[in-house]
UniProtKB/Swiss-Prot annotation:
Top-rank lineage group of the source organism: Eukaryota
Cytoplasmic face of the membrane: 713-931
Region (Disordered): 814-840, 901-931
Disulfide-bonded cysteines: none
UniProt entry tagged with the keyword Cell membrane: yes
Transmembrane segments: 692-712
Residue ranges constituting the Cadherin domain according to the UniProt record: 31-133, 134-242, 243-347, 348-452, 453-562, 570-675
Role noted for this protein: Potential calcium-dependent cell-adhesion protein. May be involved in the establishment and maintenance of specific neuronal connections in the brain.
Native organism: Homo sapiens
Composition bias type Polar residues, residue spans: 815-840
Record's protein name: Protocadherin gamma-B2
Length: 931
């Protein structure tokens, strides 16, 4: 025993020290395995036999579970042959781009034992990309005066391949005027240059078309082409020419600034840029430049300022036209000024009401406007209007006076300021006009409620958060100004109790930050919802509401709790009995535990911490089932002890321990000496149980007396003499219908029959049939024929007769434990779940005697049986219906002894079959219940 424990300790130390020793000796670490494949391999193509290269046997592959571990799995492992297969498209250009070396690194994992191997797959490039130019056609313009030897760089072709498969050379089709040279950028990319070999002549060839080809180094090589279109441009050898040498024009003095006067035009026989002409004033005084403007591109001449006949009656303008080659032409323009209406009206604003409230009604007077014109007659008549705004109009109040009024609703949030252009025009021909801009500021009123950025909010908060921590922030905006736009936040409603909400959360009135007032507990409160309000400071104040849902996340803050085995008064576990002839895999007992947490934190696992005989028992990792791992040996002790740890799935995990005491015995008589040696103190709850039994008995007696008193008062208050007929000698009845009471206050209505025999002192109170639904009241008569007639109208047509009342159905066996659930020596040997317990008459009588003895000894604390009063140191074994097949759930670990939730075998009674147990056993069970 000591030698085996020493070897186990040495193995544990080696498992701990092995990773550190391997890190000290890098040569001992696994070597990376490299493969080389071309890109674009078909799916399921074999890269290599990974199992063979790793030194793994094909027979061990199912147990080792060799697989690929990578973020994107381009490869997979055949579980049968161990071949490394291609599982996805491998495009070298997409994965590695232009890198010269493309390597896919990934890990492979093997279990039992767990090993990680490092694999590198070198992806070789194939010539799967054609060189391509950015443009299918390249347009160039070259002047005919360009000197030979001039170079013209061209855009390079693009080839996604690398190495020999990438772009290698360019070539140009045969021609007389151009040659091709290859250049290289600092980063190594090749690009072509076009070289002019001979001088160009536009009159001989105005257009040249070439074909440029890019070729890669693949086998076979691939190529791409583009067309080069060269247009020969002309040289500047012709000057501009005006259509006229002298231009004459007449202007009225009242023409406004910007008025079109004349457009001069010059032509050039050259082409392209050499034919572009610019116009400018030539040798003119500053007065001409002050009153006239010349467009240098179009030759348009416009007035620059108001003309006045009294200042100058004519102007002479000299214009020069010049091309890019400095070849020029000149002309002159004679401008004569005619006297006319040259006084524009004036606009004067006398008063302006600003700022203007945005809730001003239509027709509100804003300003008074006065107009004035120094001309007379029709030229002095002025018309005034507002330009470009439909919300304001001018109303004439008297001659030359106008009122500016509103003509629509205003909204400061839409337009906070208006720039109104008021124009006055006289009646001259052509008319003159002037304008003035009136700026109106719109003042704010509280006409907008706050608006939240989201329609609803949801936040996740982990439980056990620090009190005072911020868990969310809401934000609402109000387009109003000043106090009307200042928003404050508050909590107005919640699905919690009104007094509890302030103890859970609060909100900052200024920032909208929601704070936790206490630490949340996921087990008590998983989610709650708040209604938050944003309210501005306007008068009257406007508000808006939004919902905030808080989800409390679970943390691993609850340790597992062991439900079985239950601890005795001294804290020790109960005993379980195991047959000596138990085969390996025999279900001994089951450790049942629960965890108050949820999700992964409630996944429980069971582990053996200590065993008096290692290797004798095995423990289910997820089920908690304790089974025999081997048969009981001659040297194994009859009493065994297991220390079991229950851990949850949290990080870090929490755990609880339970101690199992197991006794190998074939009968109850063999267990008694072991149990008698282990005298336990009396149960501290025995006195409390005694008081509860006494209280229950008193309540039952009081209830029974109340029922008798109610029946007596009912009979005494009855005014009908025939209600006493049933108590006369013989059963008599009264003609006419009586009322059969329908007792339906519970979940199922019952029918009752109370009859008093004429020559007997017994009263039979028979529970008849359970009616599936409420039935109408029937007549109560005492003769047999009438009674049978009334009962035939009962629920669902259930027959009711005297022989039916006397016949009793066999007891339902659903209450019995299955063979796997019974304590004692039954174990799992008998597969009949309907068998009775105990198995023989001797065990039954012995067990009844022990129950009576332990019950009497529990009252004075002298019980010698382990496990507390009435337990006899034995515990019910849990059957295989608790086997955890899928993800563990703590609800599957809970079993309530005596509950019919896990008892099956109700089909035997439905089919009319008698239970498997004998009549003798049924009677003994009835005795136990009475005792």
């Amino acid at each position: 025993m000591k030698a085996s424990s020493g070897r186990c300790g040495l193995v544990r130390w080696l498992q701990v020290l092995l990773p550190f020793l391997l890190s000290l000796f890098p040569g001992a670490l696994p070597v990376q395995i490299r493969y080389s494949i071309p890109e674009e391999l078909a799916k399921n193509s074999v890269v290599g036999n990974l199992a063979k290269d790793l030194g793994l046997s094909v027979r061990d592959l199912p147990a080792r579970k060799l697989r690929v571990s990578a973020e994107k799995e381009y490869f997979t492992v055949n579980p049968e042959s161990g071949d490394l297969l291609v599982s996805d498209r491998i495009d070298r250009e997409q994965i590695c781009g232009k890198q010269p070396l493309c390597v896919l690194d990934f890990d492979t994992v093997a279990e039992n034992p767990l090993n990680i191997f490092y694999i590198a797959v070198i992806v070789q490039d194939i010539n799967d990309n054609t060189p391509l130019f950015k443009q299918t056609k390249i347009n160039l313009k070259i002047g005919e005066s360009t000197k030979p030897g001039t170079t013209f760089p061209l855009d390079p072709a693009l080839d996604s391949d690398v190495g020999p498969n990438s772009l290698q050379r360019y070539h140009l089709n045969d021609n007389e005027y151009f040659d091709l040279a290859e250049k290289q950028t600092p980063d190594g990319r090749k690009y072509p240059e076009l070289i002019l070999k001979h001088s160009l002549d536009r009159e001989e060839h105005s257009l040249h078309q070439l074909v440029l080809t890019a070729v890669d180094g693949g086998d076979p090589p691939q190529s791409g082409t583009t067309q080069i279109r060269i247009k020969v441009t002309d040289a500047n050898d012709n000057p501009p020419v005006f259509s006229q040498d002298v231009y004459r024009v007449t202007l009225r003095e009242d023409v406004p600034p910007g008025f079109f006067v004349l457009q001069v035009t010059a032509t050039d026989r050259d082409e392209g840029i050499n034919a572009e002409i610019t116009y400018s004033f030539h040798n003119v005084d500053e007065q001409v430049k002050h009153f006239f403007n010349l467009n240098e591109k179009t030759g348009e001449i416009t007035t620059k300022d108001d003309l006045d006949f009294e200042i100058a009656s004519s102007y002479t303008l000299s214009i020069e036209a010049k091309d890019p080659g400095d070849l020029a032409a000149h002309c002159s323009i004679q401008v004569e000024i005619l006297d006319d209406n040259d006084c524009a009206p004036e606009v004067i604003v006398t008063s302006v009401s600003t700022p203007l409230p945005e809730d001003s009604p239509p027709g509100t007077v804003i300003a008074l406007i006065k107009t004035r014109d120094r001309d007379s007659g029709e030229n002095g008549e002025v018309y005034c209007q507002v330009l470009g705004n439909a919300k304001f109009i001018l109303k004439s109040s008297s001659k030359n006076y106008y009122k500016l009024v509103t003509d629509g609703a205003l909204d400061r949030e839409e337009i906070p300021e208006y720039n109104l252009t008021i124009t006055a025009t006289d009646g001259g021909k052509p008319p003159l006009s002037s304008s003035i801009i009136v700026t109106l500021h719109i003042s704010d009123v509280n006409d907008n409620a706050p608006v939240f950025q989201q329609t609803s909010y949801m936040v996740h908060v982990a439980e056990n958060n620090p009190p005072g921590a911020s868990i969310a922030q809401i934000s609402a905006s109000d387009p109003d100004l000043g106090p009307s736009g200042q928003v404050s936040y508050s909590i107005v409603a919640s699905d919690l109790k009104p007094r509890e909400i302030l103890s859970y959360v609060s909100v900052s009135a200024q920032s909208g930050v929601v704070f936790a007032q206490r630490a949340f507990d996921h087990e008590q409160l998983r989610a709650f919802e708040l209604t938050l309000q944003a309210r501005d400071q306007g008068s009257p104040a406007l508000s808006a509401n939004v919902s905030l849902r808080v989800l409390v996340g679970d943390l691993n803050d609850n340790a597992p709790r062991v439900l079985y085995p239950a601890l005795g008064p001294d804290g020790s576990a109960l005993f379980d009995m195991v047959p000596r002839a138990a085969e390996p895999g025999y279900l001994v007992t089951k450790v049942v535990a629960v965890d108050a947490d949820s999700g992964h934190n409630a996944w429980l696992s069971y582990h053996v911490l200590q065993a008096s005989e290692p290797g004798l028992f095995s423990l289910g990792l997820r089920t908690g089932e304790v089974r025999t791992a081997r048969a009981l040996g001659d040297r194994d002790a009859a009493r065994q002890r297991l220390l079991v740890a229950v851990r949850d799935g949290g990080q870090p995990p929490l755990s609880a321990t339970a101690t199992l005491h197991l006794i190998f015995a074939d009968s109850l008589q063999e267990v008694l000496p072991d149990l008698s040696d282990r005298r336990e103190p009396s149960d501290p709850q025995a006195k409390l149980q005694f008081y509860l039994v006494v209280a229950l008995a008193l309540i039952s007696v009081l209830f029974f007396l109340a029922v008798i008193l109610a029946i007596s008062l009912r009979l005494r208050l009855s005014s009908r003499s025939d209600a006493w007929d049933c108590f006369q000698p013989g059963l008599s009845s009264k003609p006419g219908p009586g009322v059969l009471p329908n007792y339906s206050e519970g979940t199922l209505p019952y029918s009752y029959n109370l009859c008093v025999a004429s020559q007997s002192a017994k009263t039979e109170f028979n529970f008849l049939n359970i009616t599936p639904e409420l039935v109408p009241a029937q007549d109560l008569v005492c003769d047999n024929a009438s009674w049978e007639q009334n009962t035939n109208h009962g629920a669902a047509g259930v027959p009711f007769a005297s022989d039916t009342i006397l016949k009793q159905a066999p007891p339902n066996t659903d209450w019995r434990f299955s063979q796997a659930q019974r304590p004692g020596t039954s174990g799992s040997q008998n597969g009949d779940d309907t068998g009775t317990w105990p198995n023989n008459q001797f065990d039954t009588e012995m067990l009844q005697a022990m129950i009576l003895a332990s019950a009497s000894e529990a009252a004075d604390g002298s019980s010698t049986l382990g496990g507390g009063a009435g337990t006899m140191g034995l515990s019910a074994r849990y059957g295989p219906q608790f086997t955890l097949q899928h993800v563990p759930d703590y609800r599957q670990n809970v079993y309530i002894p005596g509950s019919n939730a896990t008892l099956t075998n109700a089909a035997g009674k439905r089919d009319g079959k008698a239970p498997a147990g004998g009549n003798g056993n049924k009677k003994k069970s009835g005795k136990k219940e009475k005792k």
